[in-house]
Design a protein with these regions (language model features):
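Acidic (E/D-rich), amphipathic helical modules within compact regulatory domains
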Residues: 196, 215
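Acidic (Asp/Glu) and glycine-rich low-complexity loops/linkers
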Residues: 2-135, 141-155, 161-174, 180-192, ...
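C-terminal amphipathic alpha-helical segment
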Residues: 216-218, 224, 236-241, 246
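Short, local alpha-helical segments
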Residues: 250-252
């Protein structure tokens, strides 16, 4: 290594150390608040919503969506996020509609943006006819304080968590986000993902359909009155103390494992995987098919 190369290496190392020292000094001055690195301004806006409604429709691009039961019986929308995010909320005619818009000019997309915007909808009632949500990258969380007749949620990369019961149909679709449903009862439950994970716990429903490509499906204490239908490409399927009148599971490379609450007539097929199932001849039909995955099912005591 010649002298000139050594000088350049020493200079580069010095600049790296200097950058680290300056960064640490700057963050210490901000009490290590990484939000201070952002170039955009944040704001909190509250929208008072007048009118009577029984249906709710929300269209969001990047904001997380949360719901709360209003403590004073009024409806309002509280939004926290960058100043370039605009919101429109109105309930002059059923349904209540909430929409989000990005008000930036093209040159304002250049900058440092820290944190996730969030909208919280405070609702005066606990029961509504319908909830429809279209979400891109934000997360959606619905607490068990509410109950709906129908629910339809679709998201691209956001995660969806629902703890609210639905009397008729609950349909949730996500591309790369995860889906969690817990402690609910519903008529028909439809859950679809591309690469996300699906967790359903402590749930009762009339029918359950779950489709997915590479995401796993976990069912824990899920009771389906009629038919449980699962289709997966490479994801695993797990049951824990679950039951249904009829079960159909089809996967390509995923394993199917778990326990059921009652005996079934098992019809299984796997090309290269192993099969371990109870030798029962009574109960509803449980059909499980996989190409390279294992099949391991037991009957819980």
């Amino acid at each position: 290594m010649n002298k000139k190369t050594k000088i350049w290496l020493i200079a580069a190392a010095f600049l790296v150390v200097l950058g680290v020292v300056l960064f640490a000094a700057g963050m210490a001055a901000q009490n290590w608040d990484y939000g201070a690195l952002g170039t955009g301004k944040n704001r909190t806006e509250t929208y008072e919503i007048q009118g009577t409604f029984h249906k709710i429709s929300i269209d969001s691009t990047i904001s997380d969506i949360a719901f709360e039961l209003s403590e004073n019986g009024t409806c309002r929308l509280v939004c926290n996020g960058p100043a370039y995010i605009g919101f429109d909320a109105a309930a002059q005619e059923n349904p209540l509609t909430v929409s989000e818009t990005d008000e930036r000019e093209w040159y304002e997309h250049i900058g440092i943006f820290i944190g996730t915007p969030k909208m919280t909808l405070y609702l005066p009632e606990a029961e509504y006819d319908a909830l429809v949500i279209h979400e891109d990258t934000g997360d959606v969380s619905i607490p068990r304080d509410f109950r709906f007749k129908n629910m339809e949620i679709d998201a691209s990369t956001g995660n969806i968590a629902n703890y609210a019961s639905v009397s008729d149909t609950m349909k949730i679709t996500a591309s790369t986000g995860d889906i969690r449903v817990e402690g609910v009862s519903t008529g028909a439950l439809e859950l679809s993902v591309s690469t996300g994970r699906v967790d359903v716990r402590d749930t009762m429903c009339g029918n359950l359909i779950s489709n997915g490509s590479t995401g796993d499906l976990t069912l824990d204490n899920v009771i389906v009155a009629e038919k449980l239908t699962v289709e997966r490409s490479t994801g695993d399927v797990g049951f824990d103390r679950c039951d249904a009148g009829e079960i159909s599971v089809v996967t390509d490379t995923g394993d199917v494992r778990g326990s059921l609450c009652s005996e079934k007539v098992f019809l299984t097929r796997t090309d290269t995987g192993r099969v371990q199932i109870p030798q029962s001849v009574t109960g509803g039909v449980c059909r499980i098919e996989t190409d390279t995955g294992d099949i391991t099912i037991s009957i819980s005591e």
